[in-house]
C-alpha cells in the first residue's frame, strides 16, 4: 500500500519565507521525483473496492416464485423456533405479503426489550436466503 500513498504532506517547521506563515503544510516530493499516477491510483482503489464488496447471490440461488418463497420463509422460521423456545418464547409466521413478513412473537419474546434486535436477525437471515430485501414486522394486536 505504501506505493499508493507515496505522496504525503509534511509540516514546514523551518523559517517562513516572507509573506508566508510558519507551520504551513507543504507537499513532500514523491519517491523518485515523479508525481503519482492518479489513474493507476484510482484503478487500484476501484479494484480493492470490488474485491471487498459483497457479491449478490447467484441467479440459481434466488427464490422467485411466491409459493416457493413462502415455503422457504416458513422453513427458515421453523428452523429458528427451537432457539426462541429455549428462552421461553416462540415465533410464528403469520403471513408474507410482497416484501413484508409478518410474525407473531409470544411467551417471553413478546415483551422482551431485545425483540427489535431479534426481528432484525430474522430479517437478515431471510434477506440472505431469499436474495432480496424483505421487512420482518411483528403482529400488532389491537
Swiss-Prot record:
InterPro entries: FSCA_dom_sf, NIF_FeS_clus_asmbl_NifU_C. One of its GO terms (molecular function) is iron ion binding. Residues 14-23 have a biased composition (Low complexity). Pfam families: NifU. One of its GO terms (biological process) is nitrogen fixation. Residues 1-36 are annotated as: Disordered. Keywords: Nitrogen fixation. May be involved in the formation or repair of [Fe-S] clusters present in iron-sulfur proteins. Belongs to the NifU family. This is Nitrogen fixation protein NifU 2. The lineage of its organism: Bacteria, Pseudomonadati, Pseudomonadota, Alphaproteobacteria, Rhodobacterales.
Amino acid at each position: 500500500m505504501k506505493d499508493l500513498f507515496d505522496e504525503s504532506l509534511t509540516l514546514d517547521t523551518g523559517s517562513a519565507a516572507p509573506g508566508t506563515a510558519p507551520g504551513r503544510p507543504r507537499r513532500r516530493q514523491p519517491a523518485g521525483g515523479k508525481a503519482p499516477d492518479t489513474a493507476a491510483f484510482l484503478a487500484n482503489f476501484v479494484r480493492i473496492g470490488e474485491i471487498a464488496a459483497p457479491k449478490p447471490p447467484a441467479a440459481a440461488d434466488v427464490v422467485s416464485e411466491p409459493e416457493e418463497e413462502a415455503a422457504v420463509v416458513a422453513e427458515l422460521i421453523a428452523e429458528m423456533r427451537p432457539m426462541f423456545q429455549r428462552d421461553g418464547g416462540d415465533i410464528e409466521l403469520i403471513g408474507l405479503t410482497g416484501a413484508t413478513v409478518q410474525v407473531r412473537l409470544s411467551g417471553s419474546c413478546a415483551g422482551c426489550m431485545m425483540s427489535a434486535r431479534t426481528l432484525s436477525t430474522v430479517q437478515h437471515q431471510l434477506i440472505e436466503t431469499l436474495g432480496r430485501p424483505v421487512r420482518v414486522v411483528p403482529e400488532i394486536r389491537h
